[in-house]
Amino acid sequence: MPQLVPFYFVNEITFTFVIITLMVYILSKYILPRFVRLFLSRTFISKLSDISKK
């Protein structure tokens, strides 16, 4: 199993770091802002709805 051969440790650690860094960048730049905007718009709509019911 190549995962247990010490020769491959540096390679695995490097690619793991690259993949995690890439995923964090993609999530923070593209995916998460959409969810934040969606949440804020839903909150705003619910507050407007509450105001109109009074």
Swiss-Prot record:
Pfam families tied to this protein: Fun_ATP-synt_8
Under PANTHER family, the record lists: ATP SYNTHASE PROTEIN 8
Q: What's an example of a GO molecular-function annotation for this chain?
A: proton transmembrane transporter activity
Subunit field text: F-type ATPases have 2 components, CF(1) - the catalytic core - and CF(0) - the membrane proton channel.
Q: What organism is the protein native to? A: Neurospora crassa (strain ATCC 24698 / 74-OR23-1A / CBS 708.71 / DSM 1257 / FGSC 987)
The molecule here is called ATP synthase protein 8
Please provide the record's keywords in A-Z order: ATP synthesis, CF(0), Hydrogen ion transport, Ion transport, Membrane, Mitochondrion, Transmembrane, Transmembrane helix, Transport
Transmembrane segments annotated in the record for this chain:
13-32
Q: Major place of localization? A: mitochondrion
Q: Which domain of life is it from?
A: Eukaryota
* Family indicated by similarity: Belongs to the ATPase protein 8 family.
Lineage of the organism: Eukaryota, Fungi, Dikarya, Ascomycota, Pezizomycotina
Q: Which gene encodes it?
A: atp-8
Biological function: Mitochondrial membrane ATP synthase (F(1)F(0) ATP synthase or Complex V) produces ATP from ADP in the presence of a proton gradient across the membrane which is generated by electron transport complexes of the respiratory chain. F-type ATPases consist of two structural domains, F(1) - containing the extramembraneous catalytic core and F(0) - containing the membrane proton channel, linked together by a central stalk and a peripheral stalk. During catalysis, ATP synthesis in the catalytic domain of F(1) is coupled via a rotary mechanism of the central stalk subunits to proton translocation.
Keyword GTP-binding belongs to the record = no
Q: Name one GO biological process term.
A: proton motive force-driven ATP synthesis
User: What do the Gene Ontology cellular component annotations say?
Assistant: mitochondrial membrane; proton-transporting ATP synthase complex
Location of the protein in the cell: Mitochondrion membrane
Topology in the membrane? Single-pass membrane protein
